């Protein structure tokens, strides 16, 4: 059974579970800064709170500042830190992950390393372990992450909601659809660095439609559209997520993103249309 920390690590409720078989720290970026801190080092220190004495930790590729914090925390607890390396990334790529996105190869490599560490000492044949890992990576699904809801007209949804996530999405779109431009539909929380998120998307954008997600923390769609227009890109706000399917353009690609709240609403619209 796998438990995911909801926020940070040091004060997260998952710490009440006792000692796991393995702890895993994925790539650290700027998010929840009002709680976790304003620098990568501060955020990494909070994430390092899941590292426990006697429990090995797997660490995904990190910025050097974050990696140094995590390795010091592991050393202080006297545990081994298995850092995902380039050869792990290449092995994961060869397994053909079922999830779209260049960043999913990194996630797959991290999951592969975590499984190997968790099974260390277990009576599992090496070849069987390889088969199970390969099958899991190939069959993995992740609703709301580069998920294609419609192929014609094309609509992809992605729950990326911070600048790191948007950058990963942009890189993946450039790899999957080189030289293409996109219509973006965007809804964000007001406490996110949405200006940096917009900046990541501008080079790939034909235009934007903005919405106000159903959350007390939501940024008003018109405010977001106004900020985008200041960058010289067409943008207008709509009041209902249910309008989005009617806005799609044949033979062109639309990407909806910016908030898991918004993506959840849009997925519900499509499920109700089925």
For each predicted feature, which ranges?
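C-terminal helical cap/extension that packs against the catalytic core
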Residues: 60-84, 154-155, 163, 198-253
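Nucleotide phosphate-binding/pyrophosphate-handling subdomain across enzymes
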Residues: 8-24, 28-29, 42, 92-207
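Short amphipathic alpha-helical segments
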Residues: 12-16, 36-38, 70-71, 168-170, ...
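A glycine-rich beta-strand to alpha-helix segment
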Residues: 243-271
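Flexible, gly/pro- and Lys/Arg-enriched active-site loops
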Residues: 28-34, 144, 209-227, 270-274
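Structural motif
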Residues: 60-62, 159-160, 186-189, 213, ...
